[in-house]
Amino acid sequence: WIMGHMVNEIYQIDEFVDLGANSIETDITFDDDAMAEYSYHGVPCDCMRWCHKWEYVNDFLEGLRRATTPGDSKYRKQLILVVFDLKTGDLSSSTAYKGGKLFAEKLLRYYWNGGSNGGRAYIIISIPDIDHYAFISGFRDALKKSGHEDLLAKVGYDFSGNDDLNSIRGALHKAGVKDREHVWQSDGITNCLLRSLDRVNEAVKNRDSSNGYISKMYYWTIEKYATVRDALNAEVDGIMTNYPDVIVNVLNEDSFKNRFRMATFDDNPWELFKR
């Protein structure tokens, strides 16, 4: 999965897919009532990127729905996975549940079209703070109570704060998420800084073990050719990047073209890939 980073305006969906992304990451900010308000990152953000692009969440979700609904004039077949980077910093552990409930209701209305012919992409709820695990509980409960529990088959979970893996596993369990139940594990840092692959290697080892909790592992945010090669050699499942074309180029190199391929809609993002 080539994951286009910080896609917060609708026009950027086409921009990143045209560069080779089959997945995008979108930042979601919340108002004082725990309601998702904007697709917006703000400062600081990655080097060489403009931090202030934004849409109203409802508008972005409708644009995203069109881009991922077969038959729509805006449909992009390649776009199969969306990571919502949830900026829950202004939520408390007590309002996180409400935030998750309201975000599920918003996705149901504006992205899934009330459960009728909505967008088809898989969704990852990515939360930076393990203390906000109740966001996941609220999200899941809202879909169940609305009679759309079936949509949870399209939803995965990630804690993105580079916490201890056992602590993340515990937070997932508190949220009601079982081991390997659609669990993506991220590791990374802004492209302005360097980061070792130590935790990536630890997460990959967990993913590949008989008693791990991780389904897939992705690394963010990289675009240097050497770093991309190192990440692929570490056997990650996804790479988040500002330059999808760089990842495409590396995948086409002799040492990788027979080991990796781009994921398609037929590849289940929740299944452990047996190497």
Swiss-Prot record:
Single annotated GO MF: lyase activity
Membrane-spanning segments: none
Statement: the UniProt record of this protein carries the keyword Lipid metabolism: yes
Cofactor: Mg(2+)
Active site, per annotation: H5, H41 (nucleophile)
Domain of life: Eukaryota
Tissue specificity field: Expressed by the venom gland.
Binding site for Mg(2+): E25, D27, D85
Function: Dermonecrotic toxins cleave the phosphodiester linkage between the phosphate and headgroup of certain phospholipids (sphingolipid and lysolipid substrates), forming an alcohol (often choline) and a cyclic phosphate. This toxin acts on sphingomyelin (SM). It may also act on ceramide phosphoethanolamine (CPE), lysophosphatidylcholine (LPC) and lysophosphatidylethanolamine (LPE), but not on lysophosphatidylserine (LPS), and lysophosphatidylglycerol (LPG). It acts by transphosphatidylation, releasing exclusively cyclic phosphate products as second products.
Protein name stated in the entry: Dermonecrotic toxin LamSicTox-alphaIV1ii
Organism: Loxosceles amazonica (Recluse spider)
